[in-house]
Amino acid sequence: MALILLTVAACLYSTGAGNIFGAKVDWSSQHSVFPEYFRQQFYRTGQFFPEFALNIGGGQNIYNFSYYGLFSPVVLIGYLLPNVKMSDYMMVASIVCLAAAVIILYRWLKSREFTAAVSGMTALMFLFAGPMIYQSSHQIMFVNYMPFLCLTFCGIDRYFEQKKSGLLIGGTFLMIMTSFYFSIGGILALGLYGIYRYARTKERAEEMITVKGFLGDGLRFAGRILTAIMLAGVLLVPTAMALLGRSGSKGEKTDLWQLLTPQINLEKFLYGAYGPGLSCLMLIILLTGLFYKKAYEKILSLGCLVVLTVPFFSYLLNGALYVRPKSLIPFLPLMCYLTAKYLEKLKNQKIGRIWMLLPCLAVVIYIYLKKDDMKSEVLWKLLLLDAVITLLICVAQAYSVWIRKYLTVAVLGPVILSLIITGSYSWEKSGNLESRKAYEEDTSRAIGKAVDKAITSDGGFYRVEQVGNEEKNAENLNRVWNSEQYITSLYSSSYNADYQNFRKNDFQVEQPYRNFLMQSVSQNPVFRQLMGVKYLISSQNVPGYEKKWMTRGGDVYCNENAAPIAYKTNQTMSEAEYDRLDFPYNQLVFTRYAVTKDGTVSAEQVKEELAEDVEKCDFRIPEKNNGISLVVPTENGYQVKMKKAQEFEVAVPEQEEKDGVLFVQFRIENKKPKKDIEISLEGERNKLSSIQHMYYNGNTVFTYAVGLEKGQKTVRLSLGKGEYTIKDMSAYTGVLNEGTDLYQSVFRVDKEQTKGNLIQGRIKSQKDGMFITSIPFDKGFEMTIDGVKVKCEKVNKAFLGFHLEAGKHKIRILYHAPGVTAGKILTGLGVLIVIAGAVRKKKCAE
């Protein structure tokens, strides 16, 4: 009970005054929002195994988002609480998971015959380890599997001592379903502990270990783990298929020799929230373990040391994408076990003095020599102090009975204190917890009612998006309020590659965030029209949109010229001709033509048609040199040096007759590539992230399309802090053609039938043409026209379409996530194996 209360108190204390136990961006836009969406879809469809997420990112394979808890038992419990906000539930669930992990770890250590003092202090060290509390409110998938991982360690003991497999298989299965990404490291840690327990069991039974016996017993143990993996097949197989279709995360360039050379990044490896997060005592224990008397104890220490220090394992556990210590977090319980073992041996004086002191000295010297490699001198001093204190305690306990009596507190007390200090420092430095006020605003049901009003007022197939400043947009990247609300934005580590490429390279949508994975709602009016964003929920006026209603959750704006999500047209141009179009024609063409494999018009014809609506214009940034801002024209652009962000007024041609659009594009060359650059035009922001950023966005071409109101003569340009060159600038003014006959026949969606992985409706067409959607293309689609299966093709460079003959038709679009059937079969086989094992065991018992 004391450990539970302490865990809850530590979590509440970490939030500070006026905050919630949840962070901005990742937690608020992913880890709390995706579970809400999964629950919404379950309520809407009743399907326990969904396949498609039509509502997010234009419409994508739902297994792109499985990382965020699609089948997590932690999330599934929330399905039983329909009147509770999923975000509220996830906060409570994270604290419960953390408390459960601490208690199970404590009980596991007690079952291994460690004293209550050793078990309790080690459990506290586990609680205050860098990632545990921090990630429970940030990226919860980093740690929320810990109760099941700790339970599986208990299952291994039970397997070797009682020959019972249930807890081993069940714990591994639940760990995988909770966080498949981190379960890989978890299984490796379980494997190391399994070898250790096997050897120890054989020793106690006074049995010899033979190669044949080890291989046979090892295969039987691995079979239990494999059974758990098979049980999780319904998650793992379709997720693997979805990940294979991802691009853009090709991983870091790696050198084989560097991967195989042991190394420790002290700042990331120790204390940090993105690694195991223990103190330098962990290194001392691993080194000391190499000198234990028993071979299996040496093997366990050596195995952990190799995995934790050789980058190859971190690289492998991160899916061969990069070398980051986050994949080593699952080794934390095993390190706690080794800590308890070390304290037991130290107290019973089973470690020779020289083997006790040498590792301490080695770590002290290593930390001292690494001073120049560490960014934080404060952390370096803390590490050095921590190592020196451990050294002094080890020396003192050899001569003092009193210190040996209170050895656990003497050794782990300073460690826990240092973990608390560094943890508090990390929380304060990050400063990214969501304030309670902002949280209540972001999750206010009034916004949901505004969305509902827009949806219920329109029987068509359109999108409704929520827009605000960039911070608010980041919070809402994946947020949908209604199962019939569809949005274009997305923030996920896995995504539809065609859609991502279209946004970035073909259409060139603005990139307001430093993380390339964050695909924001766009302020580009042409993109909004193309994607069928008919309604916007906003607190500010939106050019090109008419205010329809005022609500407590925001004003509802409407654009009657937005494209339907699906329609038929015979106005087409080929992909080859589209690729010849430059900016802004590569955007505006979508207001007049659909791009198909074989089109009817040329790039020259498109430019001629658009000439009456598009005009090249000057866009001259005012020259300035006042000691804070330096803006100097060059032959091909501007040289900019800003000590802080500053706003400029730039003259543009007046819109005399009606609202228009200003198109601006230029290249950016960062003179200080380790710093971010951001430039905003009329509030539309582009950002180039530091080349050192984990998810570098590569946004070196800034593209803008901003609405201009009738009579507007100037626009606001904000140049961000930094030193950079603007070059190859082009600017145009234009108007969006309101009289377009591109959308010749509109798809009438059946809202009752359209749910889950099914889109159904009718269309009436007088001419042959192409059925065009703004749903990203995927090979998993199966389409029928009047019950007859037809071949789908990619249209508009990234979206779903097919040929449609004249007449009245019933359209049915069904999505099958690749790998789902195979995954279900694998899970079924796993269930049969478990049943067969249970039956066999029962017969043997009889």
Segments from the language model and where they lie:
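Membrane-embedded helix bundles of polyisoprenyl
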Residues: 3-9, 94-108, 116-200, 220-240, ...
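Active-site-proximal, structured, solvent-exposed surfaces of multi-pass membrane proteins
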Residues: 35, 615-846
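Extracytoplasmic/lumenal acceptor-recognition loop(s) of multi-pass membrane glycoenzymes
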Residues: 58, 414-438, 455-529, 563, ...
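A cross-kingdom signal targeting lumenal/periplasmic-facing segments of multi-pass membrane
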Residues: 77, 486-626, 697-701
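Transmembrane alpha-helical segments
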Residues: 101-109, 148-160, 188-196, 283-287, ...
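Periplasmic/ER-lumenal interhelical loops and adjacent helix-loop junctions
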Residues: 213-329, 371-378
